[in-house]
Structure formats: structure tokens, C-alpha cells
């Protein structure tokens, strides 16, 4: 009599060891009754780690604002301010864009924001990966096979000279693996990922602040280039007035040929200066387009109001103001979070020295059939379930764990040094930016006074020349000095505006970021 027997066996690989589990036979109907609850549990587990991307900014066009607290001797306070994705603006050639509109356009179009946004999303997804380490791993598998054999008979039986057999088997199974306890290693890994995600969000905010500053800087420079062109055009008008006065004196027989040639030379010089000013204006416009992230061939109007900023003295920031600025600068917050993440990596590396407790189990059923030519089919169904708890204790690994701990401590020390350097550099930038603003304010006042005196000198020299008292040389010199004073005043005013924007940038006040309190 031929017999066919199915013996179910599976192998689980857990923490480097192979665990063999033999099946405990159970009735098939009990196995079928357990399948729906198991499937329901699987769907519930799949929904446990699906929202980690919510840690990232919701849009590449707006800075990140989150609600989170990190406790580790120091506290990061965040405020929730949800933002929505804005539509990309269409360039209206008839509209004159002001600075706030240009900043919004840059946040929507500049590729740096989208790059930083994707990096923040990747860091947030990494947090989701670490959270999944706390959940069990359930694997479903189905193994099936078919076998056909033909055996020649020594004697013919009836019309059959061969014995043919067929058999097939189907074995579905569910395997469970769950790490129950690891002395805080997974928790340390998750905390490190959370800090890294926070640092990525701060870097995203830093990119936004830099873009805002770049737009303001290029906007002011473009406005200064426009003002220089206006000043140069005014110089051309003044030189033409001087030429008219020289020609009138020439007709009266008072002016010489040299005076007339000098007046014409002044006009030609003014025309050349106007061409140069126009080129500089176009270059400044392209720099603004680059900061906005729009094509170079874009046609748009930019509204730049006349210089009306009051040049009031600026007091240097107090130590308390500097501390507050450091507590809200994104780069300082990012380096601080990375330093905390590096410390958590030390805890994760040290946990490799400790044992781990895990749970493993399986649930399977088998369906087989055996056919012999000329005989009725033989079918059988088997089922089995298994569950066990195991402990792994690392004994020797050739010093690999010690090297990992030393490496983690080295990275932590390096991250701490980077944080201190970033904080010190930021404080130095704030002091330097305040000094630059003070110097620019003083230069602006002096340049404004210079323009007034140069204008009076030019008017007096021109009137004197018209009445035959002054000389053409004095008038030309006064006109050139007036243009120089006007350009210096434009540059000084622009430096004041850029210096003020730079001070706000280095103090982290371009957006509304989170603040870090208690940092030392």
C-alpha cells in the first residue's frame, strides 16, 4: 500500500539565528475560523504608520510651522499655523509688482524651496520607518507543487505496462515576527530620526528666509539702478542746458571755440553714462529675476517707490536681543537638533550590548492529493500553529559594537562643536550686521547733505556762466560733482535698505520661526 504524508515545517531567521518550528496539528475548521480576525489585524497594523509625512512642511511655498516639544534639558516651542498651497501667479505685464508680491512669487517659483521641501519630506518619512520598528512583521506565503511519476512494471497488468502517480500540494501560511523589548534601542533611533526631521524643517525655513533676503537685496539694487539711470538722464539734461548756454554765448561772440567743445564733450559723456546706466539696470533686473526664479525673458513692471526711508540712528542689539535672535535662527535650531540626534545615536549603539526579547509564530494549513492510476484519489488536509518567545544575547562580535559606540560618540562631539560654532558665528553676524547698518546710516546722512550742497553749487555756477561771470570749466565740474553726489546718495540709501534687511535676516526675523529657549 502506498502512503503520502505531509509534514509541515518552516524556518524563521531572527537576529542571525535559524529557528525551526514543527507544527502542532489543529482541526482545519479552527484554522479557517481564525483567518478573518487575522486579516482584520493586518489592515489595522497597516494604518499605524501612514502619517509620518505630516511632520514635513505642507507646501514648498510657505515656511514650516509645527506643534512639537522636545524635552532634553532644553525646550523647543513651536506654534501650529497650517498653510495651503497657493496657485502659481501669472505675470501681469500691466501691473506694477511691489516687494510683498515679489516675495510671494519667489516662494512659489524658486526651485530651492521645492528641493528643501522634498528633503524635509524624506526626513519625515524616515521617522515613519523608525516607528514601524515597534510593530510586528507579518508575512503571508503560499507554497504549491505538482509531481508526476511513471514506473515501468515488470509484468503487464491488463493493458497497463506502467504505473503512473500524480500528487499536488498547496500550503498557505502566516508567519509573525515581533521584537518585544530591546532596552530602548528603537526608541533612541526614533528620537534621532525625529530630531533629524526637525532639523530638515528648520533648514527648509532657512531657505525661505534666504530667498526673502535675496529678493529684498536684488529688489533694492534694481531700484538703485533705476535711480542711477534717472540721475544720469538728469545729468544729460543739465549738460544740454550748459551746451545751450555756451552756444548762446558763442553767438554773442563771448564764448570761445574751446568752451563750445567742452560743452559738447560734457553732453557726449552724459550720453555715454546713460548707456552704461541702462546696461546696469538690465543686469540688476536679471539678478532680480534670478532671485524670483522666473525666466530671464519675462516682461514685468516693478514698482520701486522713491527713497523716503528716514535715516534714524540705529542702536546696537543688546545681549538679550542677540540671545533671542539666536533662539529663533533656523540654522542654529537645525544644528542644535542634529546635536541632540547624535546623542540619541550613542544610546542606540550602546543598546547593542544588551539582550533582545522577541515573539515569533506561524499559522499554516496544507491541502494535498495523491492519485494512482486505476485507484481512487487519496486526499488529506493538515493544519498547524506555533508561537514562541525567544531571547538573544550578543556575546562576541570582534569589537564591532565597541567601534560603533566610539563612532557614535565621535559624531556626537562633532555635532556639538558644529552647534557651538554655528551659534557663535550667528552672534558675530548679528553684531557685524548692526555695525554695517550704523555705518550705512551715517553715510546716507552725509550723502544727502552732499547732494544738497552740490545742487546749490551747480545752480550757482550755471547762472554765473549764463551771465558771463563764471567759466565753462567750473560749470562742467559742478555738473559732474552733482552727478557723483546723486549716485553716492543712491548707493548710500541702497546700502541702508540692504543693511536693514540683512540685520533682519541674521536675526531670524524674515519669517515667524520657532524659538529655542535655554540654549547655552
Where are these regions (language model features)?
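Sec/SRP-type N-terminal targeting helices
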Residues: 114-115, 131, 166, 180-208, ...
Amino acid at each position: 500500500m502506498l502512503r503520502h504524508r505531509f509534514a509541515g515545517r518552516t524556518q524563521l531567521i531572527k537576529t542571525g539565528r535559524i529557528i525551526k518550528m514543527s507544527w502542532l496539528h489543529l482541526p482545519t475548521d479552527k484554522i479557517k475560523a481564525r483567518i478573518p480576525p487575522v486579516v482584520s489585524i493586518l489592515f489595522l497594523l497597516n494604518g499605524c504608520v501612514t502619517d509620518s509625512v505630516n511632520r514635513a512642511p505642507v507646501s514648498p511655498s510657505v515656511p514650516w510651522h509645527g506643534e512639537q516639544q522636545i524635552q532634553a534639558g532644553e525646550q523647543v516651542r513651536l506654534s501650529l499655523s497650517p498653510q495651503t498651497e497657493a496657485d502659481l501667479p501669472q505675470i501681469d505685464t500691466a501691473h506694477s509688482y511691489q516687494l510683498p508680491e515679489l516675495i510671494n512669487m519667489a516662494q512659489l517659483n524658486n526651485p530651492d524651496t521645492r528641493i528643501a521641501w522634498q528633503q524635509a519630506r524624506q526626513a519625515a518619512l524616515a521617522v515613519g520607518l523608525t516607528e514601524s520598528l515597534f510593530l510586528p512583521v507579518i508575512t503571508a506565503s503560499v507554497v504549491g507543487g505538482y509531481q508526476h511519476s511513471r514506473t515501468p512494471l515488470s509484468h503487464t497488468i491488463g493493458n497497463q505496462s506502467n504505473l503512473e502517480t500524480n500528487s499536488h500540494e498547496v500550503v498557505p501560511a502566516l508567519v509573525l515576527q515581533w521584537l518585544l523589548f530591546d532596552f530602548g534601542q528603537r526608541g533612541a533611533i526614533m528620537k534621532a530620526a525625529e530630531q533629524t526631521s526637525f532639523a530638515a524643517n528648520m533648514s527648509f525655513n532657512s531657505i525661505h528666509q534666504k530667498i526673502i533676503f535675496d529678493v529684498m537685496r536684488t529688489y533694492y539694487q534694481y531700484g538703485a539702478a533705476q535711480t542711477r539711470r534717472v540721475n544720469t538722464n538728469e545729468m544729460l539734461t543739465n549738460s544740454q542746458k550748459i551746451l545751450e548756454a555756451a552756444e548762446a554765448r558763442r553767438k554773442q561772440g563771448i564764448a570761445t571755440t574751446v568752451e563750445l567743445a567742452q560743452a559738447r564733450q560734457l553732453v557726449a559723456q552724459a550720453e555715454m553714462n546713460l548707456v552704461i546706466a541702462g546696461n546696469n539696470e538690465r543686469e540688476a533686473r536679471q539678478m532680480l529675476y534670478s532671485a524670483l526664479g522666473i525666466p530671464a525673458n519675462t516682461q514685468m513692471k516693478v514698482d520701486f517707490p522713491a527713497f523716503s526711508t528716514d535715516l534714524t540712528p540705529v542702536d546696537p542689539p543688546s545681549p538679550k536681543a542677540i540671545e533671542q535672535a539666536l533662539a529663533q535662527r533656523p540654522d542654529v535650531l537645525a544644528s542644535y537638533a542634529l546635536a541632540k540626534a547624535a546623542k540619541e545615536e550613542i544610546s542606540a549603539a550602546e543598546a547593542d550590548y544588551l539582550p533582545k526579547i522577541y515573539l515569533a509564530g506561524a499559522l499554516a494549513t496544507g491541502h494535498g492529493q495523491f492519485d494512482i492510476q486505476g485507484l481512487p484519489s487519496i486526499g488529506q488536509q493538515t493544519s498547524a500553529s506555533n508561537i514562541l518567545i525567544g531571547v538573544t544575547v550578543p556575546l562576541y562580535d570582534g569589537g564591532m559594537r565597541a567601534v560603533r559606540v566610539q563612532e557614535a560618540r565621535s559624531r556626537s562631539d562633532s555635532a556639538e562643536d558644529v552647534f557651538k560654532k554655528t551659534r557663535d558665528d550667528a552672534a558675530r553676524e548679528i553684531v557685524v550686521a548692526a555695525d554695517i547698518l550704523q555705518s550705512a546710516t551715517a553715510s546716507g546722512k552725509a550723502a544727502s547733505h552732499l547732494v544738497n550742497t552740490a545742487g546749490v553749487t551747480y545752480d550757482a555756477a550755471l547762472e554765473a556762466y549764463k551771465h558771463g561771470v563764471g567759466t565753462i570749466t567750473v560749470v562742467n565740474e559742478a555738473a559732474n560733482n552733482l552727478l557723483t553726489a546723486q549716485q553716492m546718495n543712491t548707493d548710500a540709501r541702497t546700502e541702508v535698505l540692504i543693511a536693514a534687511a540683512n540685520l533682519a535676516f541674521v536675526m531670524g526675523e524674515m519669517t515667524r520661526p520657532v524659538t529655542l529657549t535655554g540654549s547655552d
